[in-house]
Amino acid sequence: MDSQRNLLVIALLFVSFMIWQAWEQDKNPQPQTQQTTQTTTTAAGSAADQGVPASGQGKMITVKTDVLDLTINTRGGDVEQALLPAYPKELGSNEPFQLLETTPQFIYQAQSGLTGRDGPDNPANGPRPLYNVEKEAFVLADGQNELQVPMTYTDAAGNTFTKTFVFKRGDYAVNVNYSVQNTGEKPLEVSTFGQLKQSVNLPPHRDTGSSNFALHTFRGAAYSTPDEKYEKYKFDTIADNENLNVSSKGGWVAMLQQYFATAWIPRNDGTNNFYTANLGNGIVAIGYKAQPVLVQPGQTGAMTSTLWVGPEIQDKMAAVAPHLDLTVDYGWLWFISQPLFKLLKWIHSFVGNWGFSIIIITFIVRGIMYPLTKAQYTSMAKMRMLQPKIQAMRERLGDDKQRQSQEMMALYKAEKVNPLGGCFPLIIQMPIFLALYYMLMGSIELRHAPFALWIHDLSAQDPYYILPILMGVTMFFIQKMSPTTVTDPMQQKIMTFMPVIFTVFFLWFPSGLVLYYIVSNLVTIIQQQLIYRGLEKRGLHSREKKKS
């Protein structure tokens, strides 16, 4: 085993990862449910079955804060448009990123209201309520830390329902407070609901990067309960009418995409029902319905919920609701990606540049891995020293494969050599590499983050492909500086073209990931020379020119 063959191991792991990722995009597994979960099948238009009404026409009001620009429909009080001024749609653009949208081409809304027996949003009670507002435009003024947008509705019996959106400066969490004033003689039974609905198919103006195999991230629904901290639910699963029906205290429901999310968080002590529904016309929904509340005659009842609409900022999301920060999609290696990001963020607090932070974290990771790297090269050197004995043994035993295997294992044991010792460090390093990939693709802080010179976005591919080429050059130098015992002509050809193959793969990878790999290769070259000097003193390595 030598570093040439190690490249084959890396290639095998890398290709396996790419095949697995492609398979993940195509497969549509049904989510595993726990004791509190029931999977039901509902027909298209099932929003009505859930007691959640369809949208209607009303007057549009606008709400602007320092971080949000929303449009709310007075018919039901749904948020039908959300712009994020702090996040441009594209690098260098003055147009803000649009998260929620209501157009003929695409629907993505955050609906909410009061259902239940006497709720104004109950379809059995007629059309959705048409709220009254005191003005059509609300703006968070300079020096103002909170903005309230009250909307009122009075039903035919004289009961008054008030829905108030509460915005805070610098906050993507919006509280939605409900007040129910019972002026009648019988108790009113109402329950809050929150629903997110979205078109399954993306129009061209929102389908960014789908043709790039290296940029696949999860887009779909998710929910959290005390029993299930974080569960994804694919849009295709909902569209196939295999819907969620979970009863739980606490938790949240959400819709996710790369870097951004919307979520409804019920704020009550009762039981909530989490559900998904196929609404028909290519639109799916995930939502919650709270346990009914009774408002006695002459009394006023109060209820509340919270809407998150914005970027996936982990620390802020964690402060809003337990496990909401898990919506940052780090894949199955989240347990590595999360601490890596925390370390990266801590480094960034000192250096102020995400690219230099990646360089520093690369040195830290490779420093921690140095004992394994040294063990890897030592194992490979011992294997090379055994090659003459192994070759002589093969010639002596001829075609007796069983004897060859037995004597080879005895030789390894006598010489205290582990034939797989050179592979273990690579197997350990590969998850770190993949975790960094997920971290770069899922962390909003790295979106449009510049490095230096021509690299203006570490989360995007190098526009001039300079970094991938440099990465290929460093791989070539590592290959040329590494001793080899490969004699098979086919293997030699594969080794020769390996840097080229990897360069082609990395053309579409995020610049930050390629930067990590370049620095890691440079560290490998330095560590390689230091280790070889130590091996020379032990007689395990010679400076003979490498044969090509």
Swiss-Prot record:
Residues 28-56 are annotated as: Disordered. GO terms for biological process: protein insertion into membrane; protein transport. One of its GO terms (molecular function) is membrane insertase activity. The chain crosses the membrane at residues 6-26, 350-370, 424-444, 458-478, 499-519. It is a multi-pass membrane protein. Residues 29-42 have a biased composition (Low complexity). InterPro entries: Membr_insert_YidC (IPR019998), Membr_insert_YidC_N (IPR028053), YidC/ALB3/OXA1/COX18 (IPR001708), YidC/Oxa/ALB_C (IPR028055), YidC_ALB_C (IPR047196), YidC_periplasmic_sf (IPR038221). One of its GO terms (cellular component) is plasma membrane. It comes from the Bacteria. It is found in: Cell inner membrane. Keywords: Cell inner membrane, Cell membrane, Chaperone, Membrane, Protein transport, Transmembrane, Transmembrane helix, Transport. Required for the insertion and/or proper folding and/or complex formation of integral membrane proteins into the membrane. Involved in integration of membrane proteins that insert both dependently and independently of the Sec translocase complex, as well as at least some lipoproteins. Aids folding of multispanning membrane proteins. Belongs to the OXA1/ALB3/YidC family. Type 1 subfamily. Interacts with the Sec translocase complex via SecD. Specifically interacts with transmembrane segments of nascent integral membrane proteins during membrane integration. HAMAP family: YidC_type1. This is Membrane protein insertase YidC. The gene is yidC.
